[in-house]
């Protein structure tokens, strides 16, 4: 981290300071209660600098989310290289990892704000950033699905991209329901979403010893 900061340009260093300050204040005071002026004071920059770099407070929050996703990529890559043998268990474990990463640094309030910003300004920066985050997860799911197809554990004639869109769409809906609720744990989120994942995969799972087209009946 120190080496990376040493190679940053002055602008990049200011952006890092702003994001660090915002993360700390959002965690301790909450997103809505934190003013841009307070972030600027903590980061030792002018409020105008923050507006110049991010335009809006929601955009700053989206950039913070992007930074956390970039930091989380090595953990996801390690998981994708060592998937569980059972596809349902693998996807459930990946959903748990995504949930843990999402809530590790950003609160439910922050996630609600980001989702709302994408709806309010569908062509805005927040919406574009949200689409990038979603596309990344979809690509990772495509990799998971194709890996299980290559292992003979998922039917081969299902389009991996389409199945990925379905899984991510349902998971995103459930995450939105979760963060909009007054309280709850990651276990509560998984309790809501995992039955839907199991239903999506019904009839697509193959027994380890089966021929490629034989499907498991899920009770």
Model-identified regions with their sequence ranges:
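Generic detection of well-ordered alpha-helical segments
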Residues: 12, 16, 20, 24, ...
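Helix-turn-helix
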Residues: 17, 21, 25-59, 63, ...
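Short coil/turn segments at alpha/beta junctions that flank glycine-rich nucleotide-binding fingerprints
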Residues: 28-32, 83, 151
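Hydrophobic alpha-helical connector segments
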Residues: 63, 77-108, 160-167, 190-193, ...
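Amphipathic alpha-helical packing segments from all-alpha helical-bundle domains
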Residues: 73, 85, 89, 105, ...
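Secondary-structure edge/capping motif, primarily at the C-terminal ends of alpha-helices
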Residues: 83, 102, 118-121, 178-182
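Helical hydrophobic small-molecule/effector-binding pocket
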Residues: 88-124, 142, 168, 172, ...
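Hydrophobic/aromatic-rich alpha-helical bundle segments in the mid-to-C-terminal region
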Residues: 109, 127, 131, 149-197, ...
């Amino acid at each position: 981290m120190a080496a990376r900061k040493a190679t940053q340009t002055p602008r990049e260093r200011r952006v890092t300071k702003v994001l660090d300050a915002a993360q700390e204040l959002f965690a301790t005071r909450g997103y809505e209660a934190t003013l841009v002026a307070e972030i600027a004071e903590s980061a030792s920059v002018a409020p105008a600098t923050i507006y110049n770099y991010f335009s809006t407070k929601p955009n700053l929050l989206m950039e913070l989310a992007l930074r956390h996703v970039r930091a989380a990529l090595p953990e996801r890559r390690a998981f994708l290289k060592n998937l569980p043998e059972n596809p349902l268990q693998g996807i459930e474990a990946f959903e748990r990892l995504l949930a843990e990463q999402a809530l590790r640094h950003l609160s439910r309030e922050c996630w609600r704000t980001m989702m709302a910003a994408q709806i309010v300004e569908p062509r805005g920066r927040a919406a574009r950033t949200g689409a990038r985050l979603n596309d990344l997860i979809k690509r990772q799911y495509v990799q998971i699905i194709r890996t299980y197809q290559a292992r003979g554990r998922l039917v081969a004639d299902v389009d991996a991209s389409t199945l990925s869109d379905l899984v991510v769409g349902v998971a995103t809906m459930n995450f939105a329901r979760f963060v909009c609720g007054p309280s709850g744990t990651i276990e509560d989120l998984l309790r809501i979403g995992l039955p839907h994942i199991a239903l999506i995969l019904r009839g697509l799972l193959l027994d380890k010893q089966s021929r490629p087209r034989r499907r498991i009946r899920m009770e």
